[in-house]
Amino acid sequence: MPDRLVSATLALRDDGTLVSPEFGELHRGASGTLARAHRTFVAGNGLPARWQRRRTFTIVTTAFGAGAGFLAAWAAWRDDPARCERLHVVAVEPHPFSRDDLHRAVSHMVVDTTISADVDALLDAWPILVPGLHRLEFDEGRVVLTLAFGDTIDLLKKLVARADAFFLDGAAASGDGIRALAKLAGEHATFATHAKSDDVKHALGETGFTFREVDDRLVGDYAPRWRARRHEPPRALPVAARRAIVIGAGLAGCAVVERLAARGWDVTLIERHERIASEASGNPAGVFHPLMTRDDNVASRLTRGGFLHALARWRALERAGHAFSRSTHGMLHLAESADDFARMRDAFDAFGPPSDYATLLDADAARAHLNLPVAQGGLLFPHGGAVWPAGLCVAQYAAAGERVRLLASTCVARLERRDDTWHALDDTGATLADAPVVVLANAGDAARLAGLRHVTLQPVRGQLTLLPPGTTAPLPCPAIGDGYAVPLDDGTLLIGATFEPDDTDPAMRAAGHAENLDRVRHLLPGLIGALPDPATLRGRVAFRWVVGDRLPLIGPLADETQATANARALGGAQARDLPRMPGLYGAFGFGSRGLVWAALGAELIASQLEGEPWPLERELADAVDPARFLIRALRARRVGSAG
């Protein structure tokens, strides 16, 4: 059963103090002031001096509340001409406010009108209240707030970050919380807190923190006398120049290009076709929605995180003038049977999502929503829908501006590493491009280029069908189930798609159109009227590459040769123990979920390269790690000398 996220509500005491009735003094920061937050947390951590002239600086705050600590840090950063290039704030909050209550709390707290624009930006970006990590960007991406909604101690154990400073408050001011923080602390990390109990001091001392009392607070440094951590927090990849090669210009590759360019990387994008988005990313539309399961499993959490992260990135692209075609009328996932609807209901009841994330509709409500007969109800995702993937790719490419160079109609025969530089070579051995970093986003060819033996990708043929305007009933939003139907802007209805594993025939088939028609007629019986011979219908064939566990492959690629040589020692390895090929990353195997996973995968890779906080929890990053199949083989003693 998933842990439900319970939001905090707000009440005003007679003395003017804002409190949360359900949780007592949980949000003490809501009734404080920015000046108090600055004195305690910002100045208490030696800021702004400590972040000056650095590329990035990371603050972990253990109780977001109404955002006093974050707003104080943001204001101090903006006022400092020697500020770091990029400020990260990772904020844990077990009981976040709704947007309306946050507005009330911040309005009560903030008297400094100079930051009113910051408050408005925070409220505008405030995420849907569902568990997990939510990444928000401000000041053109130079200030990044990663909100972690859920149990404080549990999330602190799952975060991946190298913290430079801690704003210690709330439930984390305890032994378990401080021990979790110590695993995130970088060299010379500092902390500040109002908590001064003997238990807090004991936990600080035993985990390597020094401390001293200053006025009404405790401050100190991470300065352990010994190194007892098996794994150090992540560091930036050391490179002589911030240059990268991205191979593959579909959804995965263009998302990576945009995220790297936003951080100041120069990127060479290599595409074997004449233009970007020429394969599956060239379909007229793709459906976009999360997944809900009763146990909120890894796939459910990954799709939720990817779905919400993509929405945020797309809105940022649109605000920057890089718009693309996407529907904004929601999407209805119809159950395929009574048992399927019961599973949907169980998942909905267990998760208890807010209505702006998902709503359960019975058959009558679904029928009224679509104005069409349906056999079953389903889940309505108000922010789901359909996206023109090629338009999204073009928007991301345009956002990269002068930092990207496209080599179209260019095939990479092999990769070669010399000294600290990767060379992409053609079939004559000539260098097409070179850089310290390569990201493989070229679907089925990625494993060949990287020489991966423990990654198996399967091609799946998908044929979609286009029904001419006037041949179908109006459909107010995309609908999916066993098949899908998507209304396009010109009145065409896109339906599909076939799922044909290991079939690599690119030719259009009348049988594929007939299959799509049968599936959608069952899904929405009143949608399709009389049609001509299926052999005369238009459509498109594309190939999706899927992994055995149906999860993508995102992150640094393993050095399988070195791992094989050390197989016996790596028999109990975790992902962090494996040797990696320096500067070689992958973003492939997305199957039919490229729209959901591409933006989050790109942000993960960019964060890994830069040594920034990761946008998803360790468990989820491990679940998409390209080395996961090698790890399983090592544990099963099926590799090298362990065999």
From Swiss-Prot:
One of its GO terms (biological process) is tRNA wobble base modification. It catalyses: 5-aminomethyl-2-thiouridine(34) in tRNA + S-adenosyl-L-methionine = 5-methylaminomethyl-2-thiouridine(34) in tRNA + S-adenosyl-L-homocysteine + H(+). Residues 1-223 are annotated as: tRNA (mnm(5)s(2)U34)-methyltransferase. Its EC number is 2.1.1.61, 1.5.-.-. It is found in: Cytoplasm. Keywords: Cytoplasm, FAD, Flavoprotein, Methyltransferase, Multifunctional enzyme, Oxidoreductase, S-adenosyl-L-methionine, Transferase, tRNA processing. It comes from the Bacteria. GO terms for molecular function: flavin adenine dinucleotide binding; oxidoreductase activity, acting on the CH-NH group of donors; tRNA (5-methylaminomethyl-2-thiouridylate)(34)-methyltransferase activity. One of its GO terms (cellular component) is cytoplasm. Transmembrane segments: none annotated. Residues 247-643 are annotated as: FAD-dependent cmnm(5)s(2)U34 oxidoreductase. SUPFAM superfamilies: FAD-linked reductases, C-terminal domain, FAD/NAD(P)-binding domain. Its main location: cytoplasm. Its cofactor is FAD. InterPro entries: FAD-dep_OxRdtase, FAD/NAD-bd_sf, MnmC-like_methylTransf, SAM-dependent_MTases_sf, tRNA_MAMT_biosynth_bifunc_MnmC, tRNA_S-uridine_synth_MnmC_C. The keyword tRNA processing applies. Catalyzes the last two steps in the biosynthesis of 5-methylaminomethyl-2-thiouridine (mnm(5)s(2)U) at the wobble position (U34) in tRNA. Catalyzes the FAD-dependent demodification of cmnm(5)s(2)U34 to nm(5)s(2)U34, followed by the transfer of a methyl group from S-adenosyl-L-methionine to nm(5)s(2)U34, to form mnm(5)s(2)U34. NCBIfam families: MnmC_Cterm, PRK01747.1-4. In the N-terminal section; belongs to the methyltransferase superfamily. tRNA (mnm(5)s(2)U34)-methyltransferase family. In the C-terminal section; belongs to the DAO family. This is tRNA 5-methylaminomethyl-2-thiouridine biosynthesis bifunctional protein MnmC. It comes from Burkholderia cenocepacia (strain HI2424).
